[in-house]
Amino acid sequence: MNTSIEQKPFNRSVIVGILLAGAFVAILNQTLLITALPHIMRDFNVDANQAQWLTTSFMLTNGILIPITAFLIEKFTSRALLITAMSIFTAGTVVGAFAPNFPVLLTARIIQAAGAGIMMPLMQTVFLTIFPIEKRGQAMGMVGLVISFAPAIGPTLSGWAVEAFSWRSLFYIILPFAVIDLILASILMKNVTTLRKTQIDILSVILSTFGFGGLLYGFSSVGSYGWSSSTVLISLLVGVIALLLFITRQMKLKKPMLEFRVFTFGVFSLTTLLGTLVFALLIGTETILPLYTQNVRDVTAFDTGLMLLPGAVVMGFMSPIIGRIFDRVGGRGLAIAGFCIIFLTSLPFMQLTDHTSLAWIVVLYTVRLLGTAMIMMPVTTAGINALPRHLIPHGTAMNNTIRQVGGSIGTALLVSVMSNQAAHAGTTNVKHAALHGMNAAFIVAAVIALVGFLLSFTLKKPQRPAEQQPAR
């Protein structure tokens, strides 16, 4: 049953601007501390494994909270939810800026992630609500700009700020933007979503936390501990069991926290798979290439960030344009072309040497991210368009959750292939062994891209737009 909430006339451009700005600063924080970790380790006297939790905890909190956002979006108004999310994020930023020790800084990151985890599904749901179906590609293209550009400039901005000032400046830089967006949201944001009478199921929250949290932590730990590690195996086992129990419970509940029946829509299921494949390739590539430039070519972390920046700029710039193309031609052709580009750029990456032109690598990576932009938001939009309006919050939450898991799986798979092949390279030269492993990892990436390419041919437009789908 819907809850009647007064929806006053709203300025769509204002809402879009507020949400994009809030999401940008929130998503930027995912990668903002990467190059600052050595400085934090020195100041707080912690080792690399402890410091890594500043990024791992952010990812885990996001992965745990995102599945709950479908319930939150149905329970609370879009205005209240945005203000709450930005308030939580801003509070975490303040705590981080003045953290006296490492535990407080880690707590600040978790608080930041709690706010950021709400932002992405909320932004997608609001955009899909306020834009007509024939303009959703354009809307999601703007989302693509944020999720591609924001995390990419994180390491570059971090490298500059830490060298010029201190790691605390990263929080000082973010804070005014977060405060301004919070003030604007309080004044200008309107309610645009429809509320429903729903109650939180505590057991579902617990199972979701252990399910998705276990999988994310398990897969993200493979690179550090290996597949045979008890940490990895126990985390994955707990995650799988909890997730199966979670799915079973959701199917039995009259009003589930996360509606798995979105997968009864074939187009949504296929596009979610395609989106997961391309995100796994994206995160996996962004993990392998810095290892190549820094460990094999002795390029600094800051310069590596600069090398990856053109690809992020192209991906961000092209996302809105590709969104408009999607509105005209649909997602099938874009996905086919995108996976083809990723496959073709994987071939040269399979033949990296210790003297491969760095400029050539920048060109390949930039073209590769153009292909990624042709897939990521178009297939997401195509899948959401197949859902009836009342399932859109569940579709966006499901899509973002599975993307997080897919990214961790992609990284785990490629890093484990790289490590295994490097260990059996038959050479005592460490750099040559690493190269052998990296080339093998890109062979796997090429196979994944080929699978995505073939699956893209089966993508069809939904028979009826979401507004015309019968309620279930």
Curated annotation (Swiss-Prot):
It is found in: Cell membrane. CDD domains: MFS_LmrB_MDR_like. One of its GO terms (cellular component) is plasma membrane. The keyword Cell membrane applies. GO terms for molecular function: transmembrane transporter activity. The chain crosses the membrane at residues 14-34, 53-73, 80-100, 113-133, 142-162, 169-189, 202-222, 227-247, 263-283, 302-322, 333-353, 359-379, 405-427, 437-457. Gene3D superfamilies: MFS general substrate transporter like domains, Multidrug resistance protein D. It holds the Pfam family MFS_1. It comes from the Bacteria. Keywords: Cell membrane, Membrane, Transmembrane, Transmembrane helix, Transport. The keyword Transmembrane applies. Belongs to the major facilitator superfamily. EmrB family. This is Uncharacterized MFS-type transporter YcnB. It comes from Bacillus subtilis (strain 168). The gene is ycnB.
